[in-house]
Amino acid sequence: MLLQHPPTAAEAPRFVQLSLQQDLLGGWLLVRETGHIGQRSTVKREQYLKQDEAMAAFEKARDANLRRGFQVMFAQGSEAPR
């Protein structure tokens, strides 16, 4: 899921990309990539043993970013929040 914050006069637009990935041992990774468009980004990975825990963390991160003014630009495999 790609989220983008509208640009301001002082800075370039920011983005957050969230994804869930299964690792080789059956665990799950929540991958968060954040940064300003056109600049270097930061990637953080959080590991979970169960898919339900990873999905809950994904939804929590998504909701937190939506509250901060980010907008969904692209989502695959799930319905965008209303």
What do these predicted regions represent?
Residues 11-17:
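Charged, amphipathic alpha-helical segments
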Residues 17-44, 59-60:
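Short aromatic-glycine-(Arg/Gly/Cys) micro-motifs in beta-strand/loop hairpins
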Residues 40-42, 49-70:
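A short, charged, amphipathic alpha-helix used as a generic interaction element across diverse proteins
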Residues 64-82:
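Short, mixed-charge low-complexity intrinsically disordered segments
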Residues 8, 32, 36-39, 48, ...:
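A generic structural signal for ordered alpha-helices
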Residues 1-11, 51:
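Negatively charged, low-complexity tracts enriched in Asp/Glu with abundant Ser/Thr
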